[in-house]
Amino acid sequence: ARYVHVDWNDTPLQRARLQYSQPDDLDFFPEFEVQRHRQMVDEQWARLALVGPEFPDLLNDVDPVAMRRVSQVRIQKLRFYMQAQMANQLQWCVAAVPTPAWAQKVFPHLAADEAVARLWDVILHTVRADLPDPVAAWRRHDEQLQRVTRFLAHNQVQSLHFFDPTPGADGKPASDLHVGLTDHSLWLAASSLTPEGIRFLPNMPTEEVFSAPHNQRTTGYVRTSRPCFPLERRVEGAYFRFEAGEIVAYDA
């Protein structure tokens, strides 16, 4: 690379800002950040995001309104960058790196160093880095997922049914959700192409194939079976009920 710029996200600093800033100061977003991201788009910088929570519970008691306010300002100011990224004008990839706190949540029976080593083993296996030729393995995997997308497109799938028979607190299946697709749905998977024809993998690992739903054809309900972290806050048992594409009830 001609030049590597490193951005470091620090959760304790983020917490300090959210706790001690004056409310109006939460709307501040420096102009130099806007210009830096604009240069990255203009010059088509590649982006590698290495993610791993060092303090996975540190923001649990922070005001969610303040967190949402900071996030919304950033999204608004950098919308052009996110649009360029989602349009594959830039090469980008998100990959996971173990941290002691995260590793011990996954392997609570192990000491910190042992848990980190074990999580490294799992991650390197899931990204095929433990195979003799990882690049060739990823090309095969990418092609397999592309075959799945072609099959789904050819058969004109009309809807997806997400069903989890595990009984919930009310005795009903945990999830029973019908997601209707558009009349001419498109399917994507794994690798993406830049306008110049450069192929890249935005996520490692990646196993999904995906499409876009019709905005009025989702009906039923869904519960999360694993913890999720919107705005870096741990949420368990999230529940959403849909009617004609709209959320009519939710809980967690």
Question: Model regions: which residues?
Answer:
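A broad, structure-centric signal for solvent-exposed, well-ordered loop/edge residues
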Residues: 101, 186, 229-231, 249
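Active-site bordering "gate/hinge" segments
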Residues: 1-217
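Structured, hydrophobic secondary-structure cores that serve as assembly/anchoring elements
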Residues: 236, 240-252
